[in-house]
Amino acid sequence: MLGGECTGKTSLAQALSVDFKIGYIPEVLRDFVDQCQRSPRVEEQDAILLAQCDAIGEALSELDPGATGPILICDPSPWMTAIYSLQYFGDQAMFAKAQALMLALANAHQFNWFHLHCADDIVWRADGLQRDGPSHRANSLALIEQYPPLRGIAGHDRVEFLQGGLDERRRISQCRLDDLAKCPECLGAPVINAEIIAMHSWRRKQTAKPDKSPIDSCTRIC
């Protein structure tokens, strides 16, 4: 899942998790803010990115190796950590780190990334510590468009831009995912690279379970 604050990512991700009967990976950043009662600092961005990817890797390791189609919903994609790092700290280095981790996961577990990008055309609502305002949300959208995830990497660079209410976004997402399920080769071959809402991870086969717990990682950040 891609999108700035208050763009309906979580509502859509949870709905699609039910629709497709697949796992849902929540946002490490939100857990961090809830536990630490503050926004992360620049030096904590790496740990948040790693914890988000660890959660995805652990969920992938629990799946049936023969599973196909949409297999996991990530709310949000690890790419959003890189977007926020640039937006709030002026740090572009996180893009390379996010790409390396995302492709390592894709290579290890043999799946393709597919992203759903939620527009900012819904009413902005404050929720306490984490949200900064409509202008910040608009900045996030602009940065996602300027720095799309995994650009130019065959099979992993598909992004669907979603506008409208939840029902409309849900309908379009269902249709798009159904189309891809009928034509998985449309995503291209898996990347062979040692260097991963995405909202959706596209499954080919499964490998080993990672060692680190994302909950432990988040606790250590605080």
Identify the function of each model-found stretch:
Residues 9:
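Conserved lysine of the Walker
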Residues 1:
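Hydrophobic anchor at the beta1->P-loop junction of P-loop NTPases
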Residues 5:
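The conserved Walker
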Residues 14-54:
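Conserved substrate/cofactor phosphate-moiety recognition/catalytic segment
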Residues 38-93:
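Conserved nucleotide-sensing/catalytic segment adjacent to the nucleotide-binding pocket
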Residues 89-168, 178-181, 190-192, 207:
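A glycine- and Lys/Arg-enriched "phosphate-lid" helix/loop adjacent to the NTP-binding pocket
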Residues 219-222:
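Non-Sec secretion/translocation targeting segments of pathogen effectors
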